[in-house]
Each structure stands twice: as structure tokens, then as C-alpha cells.
């Protein structure tokens, strides 16, 4: 069953003015419940604008957005409930922190859902533990934390609402490799534990290959492709023409295949590449890329 359906969705900035710009153009897609979807596209492709439609931050200029089969904008007075169903983490979410303690910041969303004090407490402690925040630190000011820790607190605040869909727009932007791996690992663990649908907007093809099951490709405001990650990245030439690149592992294996080595060129994850290289070595192949 699809948890998200976009039906001919378009969005135009500054419509009717000299600055009018089509940011999203006639997008049709259905995303199944429980999928982990990577959203990719060049800068200005419309990917961030697209995902802002999913929790009603933006209303389509035309077309409809369905969540769990319900037309999000059929009754504007009911839009608020979709913001609890679809959690959105912006780029640099640490700039959205505002409460005096970590606990209060993470509790803000669940409290506004009308949950009991006991339920809010359970959710805060569970979400912060999931992102690696020690319970002893919950009464600290979030502004005393490092950039990476602040980001984890901000993500925990959305996770604590337990949305059916969690949308993250470049959640690792500006982090060092260790910080990036930590946050992505926590998002994957959340996905495994809750079964929620995840949409991860990222410019890193390696991250999409390693964490997502499907990829949604935006190009100049239009949906170019939505399919399994392996199938999307097999279109290496088309992706390159959009100004994107496939994971480095894929480029290496494409060169190996071109040189006549018996490899599958459509390899995108390091662990799969290691397995193939070991098999080649076992067969006595001498690799020169």
C-alpha cells in the first residue's frame, strides 16, 4: 500500500509575477509504506521543494498529495494532522533548536500532539537514546553541544513524534565523515525499529547506495526516475548528464568490465565490491584498472 502518492503535482514560485519559476513540474509517484528512499538531483532540481509538499509546508500549485490515501488539502482545517504523520528535518536543523534544555526541545513535538506526560517522557528518552544522547545530559542546554550533537538533538525531536514518514533534507550537510556515518546509522536503525517510511535527500551518491533501497531522481523540476537503487545507478551516462555521479565503486567496476574482467559493472556498495574482488583473486585474476 502506498503511504505517499503525488498526483500531477506542480509548484510555481512567485506565480503571476515576472519572477515566476516552475520548481516542480507534473510529478507522479507512489511510495510504498516502509520504503527507504534516497532523493537525488542536481542543485535546483526541485528535490527540496518536492519534499516540502509532503508535510504541507507547501501547497501544490496544481495536483494532489495523498498521505495514507487521504487528500492532504481536501480540508485545509485538517492539514495539521498530516504534519504529525510526516516529520520533516530541514538542512542544518540545529538552527531550529530553541528550548532551554535538550529534554524540553525533544519534548516539544510530542507535547503538542496532546500526549500524556508519561508518554512524552518515554518518547523523549527513547528518541534521545536512539541518536546517542546520554540521559544524564537531557537537562543540559542544547546550545552547549557541538554541531553534530545539536543535529542529533534536532533529529530526535522529530523522531519522538514517531511519524509514519520521516523526511530528512541533507541531514549530514557540513558534518565530518565520522559524524555523517553516525547520523546515517541512527536513521537506518530508526527505520529498522519502527518500519517507518524514510525519504533521505542527499547529494552523496555513496550514502544513497549504502542506505536506501530505492532512489527518486529529480531533474529540472521533473521526476526523471523512481526505481530500485541498483536500477537507477545502472543509468550511469544519463545520471552524469544531469550533473550527478554514480558511487565511485560503480565507476571502478565499469572500468574493470570495459577491460574484459568478468565482473558485474552494476556494483554500488563497498561490501559487494569486496566480495567480487575476492572472487576474482580466488580465480587468479590480476587486476589493473
What do these predicted regions represent?
Residues 118-136:
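Conserved ABC ATPase "signature" region
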Residues 1-3, 12-26, 76-78:
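A short, flexible loop at the N-terminus of ABC-type nucleotide-binding domains that lies
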Residues 55:
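Helix-to-loop junction immediately C-terminal to a conserved catalytic motif
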